[in-house]
C-alpha cells in the first residue's frame, strides 16, 4: 500500500475486478425492481415496495444514488446457453463506498408506502466498458439496509427482472466515463499532519485485527466462523484466512504494495454519509472527512464501526490485495449474516464484522464491561495465543495477569 504525497504522481493501473451477482430468496416483504431500456445503454429502474408496510431504506449504494456505484450486474452471453458460451460478467469500473450506520442524514433515506415506487435512470456505459457492443444481460438483486430513527436496523431484499439489450458499440464508446483517474502529471493532496497520524494508527490496528482474524478463521472456533461465513469447510476457512493475511500484509507497508491510499477525497465522491470508498478497477482507496471525525480509531463494541475495520473493509474490495475483490452484498451484521456461504465469502462487511467480532470477543472476556451490549461471545484464549494474535497489548497483559 502506498500513501500519495504532494510530490507523487498517480499512475494508471490495470483493471482486474470481477464482481459476483447476489442470489436472494424470494420474500413477501421486499422491493421489486423493474429494469427497462430507454436508450442504447441508458437504463430505467422502477423500485416498488411489494410489502404491506411502509419501509425506509438507505438509497446510497442503491438506486437513486448519484455516485457511480454498482446498481446492476452486466453479463455477456447470458442469453445464449445453447451455444455453450461461458457467461462473463462485465467489469464494473465505478466506486464502492462504506457508509455510516447511525446518524444517517435524511437525504440518504427513502420511504416507500406499500405499492409506492421510485424511479432512477442511469447509463451503464459510464461505469463499464461496453465499447465492443453486442448482447448484454442485466439484472440486480441483493439486500438493502433499512432504518429506524436514521439508524440501520436490518435489511430488505430486492430483486429485478432479467433484461437483455443489444448495445451499439460506437454509441457506447462515446459515453463519458463517470470515474476519471487523475492525470499522470497531476499532483495530489499530501497525506500529512493529524490525518497521516490517524491513518498510520488505523493501518497498524488493521494489521493486528486482520492477523488475529486470519488465525481465528484458520484454526479458531468453528461455530464463530459459521456465524459469519455460513460454513465450516476447510477450503473456505483457508480462503478467508488467506484474504485476511493479504490485507495484513498490504496494511503493513506504506511504501510498497498493490494499492494507492489517499487521506482525502481526491475524486469528490464523499458525501455526508460516506466514510471511505474504493475504486477496485484501479486499486485506489480514499478516506472521507467522516472517517476522521465520526469513527474511533478502534472500537470495543461488538459489530460497531471504527477506522481500522473501515480500512480493512476497503482493502478487501481491492483485487490487487486479494483476487477477486469483494462486493457489498450485505451491509451490517443482520444483512451480512443473512447471506449464503458463497455470498459471504465475497462480502466486504463480513470480513470487517468477523475481524471486529474476534477482537471484541477477546475484550469481553478480559473485561465484560467493555462490551455491555455485545452479541460477540467471549472466546477463551491462553496468554500465548493472545499475544500471537494481538501482540503484547494492554488487553493481553490484563488477560495474562488474570490467567497466570
From Swiss-Prot:
Keywords: Cleavage on pair of basic residues, Disulfide bond, Hydrolase, Metal-binding, Metalloprotease, Protease, Secreted, Signal, Zinc, Zymogen. Gene3D superfamilies: 2.60.40.2970, Collagenase (Catalytic Domain) (3.40.390.10). One of its GO terms (cellular component) is extracellular region. One of its GO terms (biological process) is proteolysis. Secreted metalloproteinase that allows assimilation of proteinaceous substrates. Shows high activities on basic nuclear substrates such as histone and protamine. CDD domains: M35_deuterolysin_like. Its main location: secreted. This is Neutral protease 2 homolog AFLA_065450. InterPro entries: Fungal_M35_metalloproteases (IPR050414), MetalloPept_cat_dom_sf (IPR024079), Peptidase_M35 (IPR001384). GO terms for molecular function: metal ion binding; metalloendopeptidase activity. It is an enzyme of class 3 (hydrolase). Residues 20-185 form a propeptide. Its EC number is 3.4.24.39. Zn(2+) binds at residues 313, 317, 328. The active site is at residue 314. The lineage of its organism: Eukaryota, Fungi, Dikarya, Ascomycota, Pezizomycotina. It is found in: Secreted. Disulfide bonds join 191-263, 270-288. Binds 1 zinc ion per subunit. Residues 1-19 form the signal peptide. Belongs to the peptidase M35 family. It catalyses: Preferential cleavage of bonds with hydrophobic residues in P1'. Also 3-Asn-|-Gln-4 and 8-Gly-|-Ser-9 bonds in insulin B chain. Its cofactor is Zn(2+).
Amino acid at each position: 500500500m502506498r500513501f500519495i504525497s504532494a510530490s507523487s504522481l498517480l499512475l494508471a493501473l490495470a483493471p482486474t475486478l470481477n464482481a459476483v451477482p447476489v442470489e436472494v430468496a424470494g420474500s413477501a416483504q421486499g422491493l421489486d425492481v423493474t429494469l427497462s431500456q430507454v436508450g442504447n445503454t441508458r437504463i430505467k429502474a422502477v423500485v416498488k415496495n411489494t410489502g404491506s408496510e411502509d419501509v425506509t431504506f438507505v438509497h446510497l449504494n442503491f438506486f437513486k444514488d448519484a455516485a457511480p456505484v454498482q446498481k446492476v450486474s452486466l453479463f455477456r452471453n447470458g442469453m445464449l446457453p445453447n451455444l455453450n458460451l461461458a457467461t462473463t460478467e462485465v467489469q464494473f469500473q465505478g466506486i464502492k463506498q462504506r457508509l455510516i450506520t447511525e446518524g444517517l442524514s435524511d437525504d440518504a433515506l427513502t420511504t416507500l408506502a406499500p405499492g409506492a415506487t421510485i424511479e432512477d435512470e442511469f447509463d451503464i456505459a459510464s461505469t463499464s466498458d461496453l465499447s465492443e457492443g453486442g448482447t448484454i444481460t442485466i439484472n440486480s438483486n441483493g439486500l438493502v439496509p433499512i432504518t429506524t430513527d436514521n439508524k440501520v436496523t436490518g435489511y430488505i431484499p430486492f430483486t429485478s427482472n432479467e433484461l437483455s439489450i443489444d448495445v451499439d458499440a460506437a454509441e457506447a464508446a462515446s459515453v463519458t466515463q463517470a470515474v476519471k483517474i487523475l492525470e499522470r502529471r497531476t499532483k495530489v493532496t499530501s497525506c500529512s499532519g493529524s490525518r497521516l497520524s490517524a491513518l498510520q494508527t488505523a493501518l497498524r490496528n488493521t494489521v493486528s485485527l486482520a492477523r488475529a482474524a486470519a488465525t481465528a478463521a484458520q484454526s479458531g472456533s468453528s461455530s464463530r466462523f459459521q456465524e459469519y461465513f455460513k460454513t465450516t469447510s476447510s477450503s473456505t476457512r483457508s480462503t478467508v484466512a488467506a484474504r485476511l493475511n493479504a490485507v495484513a500484509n498490504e496494511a503493513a507497508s506504506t511504501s510498497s504494495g498493490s494499492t494507492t491510499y489517499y487521506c482525502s477525497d481526491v475524486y469528490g465522491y464523499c458525501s455526508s454519509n460516506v466514510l471511505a470508498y474504493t475504486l477496485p478497477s484501479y486499486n485506489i482507496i480514499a478516506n472521507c472527512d467522516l472517517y476522521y471525525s465520526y469513527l474511533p480509531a478502534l472500537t470495543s463494541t461488538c459489530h460497531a464501526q471504527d477506522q481500522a475495520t473501515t480500512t480493512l473493509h476497503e482493502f478487501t474490495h481491492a483485487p490487487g490485495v486479494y483476487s477477486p475483490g469483494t462486493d457489498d452484498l450485505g451491509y451490517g451484521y443482520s444483512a451480512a449474516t443473512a447471506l449464503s456461504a458463497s455470498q459471504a465469502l465475497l462480502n466486504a462487511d463480513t470480513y470487517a464484522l468477523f475481524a471486529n467480532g474476534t477482537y471484541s470477543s477477546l475484550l469481553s472476556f478480559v473485561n465484560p464491561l467493555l462490551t455491555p451490549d455485545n452479541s460477540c461471545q467471549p472466546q477463551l484464549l491462553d496468554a500465548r495465543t493472545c499475544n500471537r494474535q494481538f501482540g503484547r497489548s494492554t488487553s493481553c497483559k490484563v488477560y495474562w495477569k488474570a490467567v497466570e
